Curated annotation (Swiss-Prot):
Residues 278-333, 352-371 are annotated as: Disordered. GO terms for cellular component: COP9 signalosome; cytoplasm. Residues 278-292 have a biased composition (Low complexity). A motif (JAMM motif) lies at residues 134-147. Its EC number is 3.4.-.-. This is COP9 signalosome complex subunit 5. The keyword Chloroplast does not apply. The gene is RRI1. Belongs to the peptidase M67A family. CSN5 subfamily. It comes from the Eukaryota. Component of the COP9 signalosome (CSN) complex. SUPFAM superfamilies: JAB1/MPN domain.
């Protein structure tokens, strides 16, 4: 069962296998120093575009983030950089003072970082400090104003440096790790205009902080990898992660999170209702595309249009407040259903007497939520 769950975890998070003999695993301080001297990221704010995180580091970060509960946690990441890509190979949790909305690294954490780096060097691990991670329990993966300032300072004095954010609550609810990686722009830099990015749910009380600093940083593509050399460590880490997952009840452990999501949804519905009355006057009609160039007949219609007339096929979809609320409502419902189905499966698995067996129809009905 544990092996099946691990395979499911790897599929959900698209874990890729990397050859352990690849050049990236052969550390060269001279190569790192040469890249540091060239520092192409100083002239190109978008030089870094991808971060590859080892499965070992990912499970460590998720386990650490979940242990913090409603409070933020913080840790550091070690690895290398090559061809515009961060390779994160290991992480370490920091002893920090966290709250529900922020986390601060004090003198104790700084001393721990120095000692950890020294111990790594003595153990023959030459990877350098390449970033930090922290959690946003229940409010998504993005950088707040404090996070942006922290990352700006890190990039000034420790570049190349990366910021990673994990949402443990949404990870538990959805099954897939909710993670984001970011780099800040230099002060005074104006990023180029981009199209609408993928929508993510931000609580009402965080939207202002999110919007004010949204153009101060950019996201990197996150990929997860593992090698055959990681198998033993993954087995040990997975046993701890799997037991914690199996013994927990997301409906109970995420009760406060689920309640806050419903309350936030209610607030957004109230805000969206105020704009509905004026929405009909702002609808944009979608013109029908002609089937052949130069002809005035349109697809699905034999009607000939007069000169100057246009035919429309519907209304263009727009990202309205009501559309966003609908997406959030669907997500909350899906997460609740997943939690219920998970508990039903555990009940069938562990509470069925040994003298009985679970028939195929009953098992299928449980998976489909028809208990």
């Amino acid at each position: 069962m544990a092996s099946t769950a691990r395979k499911t975890f790897e599929i959900n998070n698209n874990v890729q296998v990397v050859d352990p003999s690849a050049a990236i695993f052969q550390y060269s301080r001279e190569e790192e120093k040469l890249l540091d001297d060239e520092a192409p990221w100083r002239t190109d704010p978008h030089y870094f575009h991808t971060v590859k995180i080892s499965a070992v580091a990912l499970i460590k970060m998720v386990t650490h983030a979940r242990s913090g509960g409603i409070y933020e946690i913080m840790g550091i990441m070690y690895g290398k950089v090559r061809d515009g890509t961060f390779w994160i190979m290991d992480v370490a949790a920091l002893p920090v003072q966290g709250t529900e909305t922020r986390v601060n690294a004090g003198n104790e954490a700084m001393e721990y970082m120095v000692n950890f780096q020294t111990a790594n060097a003595e153990a023959g691990k030459g990877e350098l400090l390449r970033g930090w991670y922290h959690s946003h329990p229940g409010y998504g993966c993005w950088l707040s104003g404090i996070d942006v300032n922290t990352q700006l300072n890190n990039q000034k004095f420790n570049d190349p440096y990366l910021a990673v954010v994990i949402d443990p609550n949404r990870t538990v609810s959805a099954g897939k790790v909710e993670i984001g990686a970011f780099r800040t722009y230099p002060e005074g830099y104006t990023p180029p205009a981009t199209g609408n990015s993928q929508y993510q749910s931000i609580p009402m009380d965080k939207i202002e902080d999110f919007g004010v600093h949204a153009n101060a940083y950019y996201p990197l593509k996150v990929e997860i990898y593992k090698s055959k050399l990681d198998e033993k460590m993954l087995d040990l880490l997975w046993n701890k992660y799997w037991v914690a997952t199996l013994s927990s009840n997301s409906l109970v452990s995420n009760l406060e999170y689920s309640t806050s999501q419903v309350q936030d949804l209610n607030a957004k519905l109230r805000a969206a209702s105020q704009s509905i009355s004026n929405s009909s006057s702002k609808l944009k009609l979608k013109p029908t595309q002609p089937t052949t160039k130069g002809k005035e007949t349109t697809e699905g219609s034999d009607k000939k249009l007069k000169k100057g007339e246009k035919e429309f096929s519907g209304v263009e979809e727009e990202e309205t407040p009501l559309n966003k609320v609908t997406q959030e409502s669907s997500r909350i419902t899906s997460e609740a259903e997943n939690g219920i189905i998970s508990q039903l499966l555990k009940e069938k698995l562990f509470n069925t007497p040994l003298t009985q067996s679970v028939d195929d129809k009953s098992a299928q009905a449980t998976v489909q939520g028809r208990y």
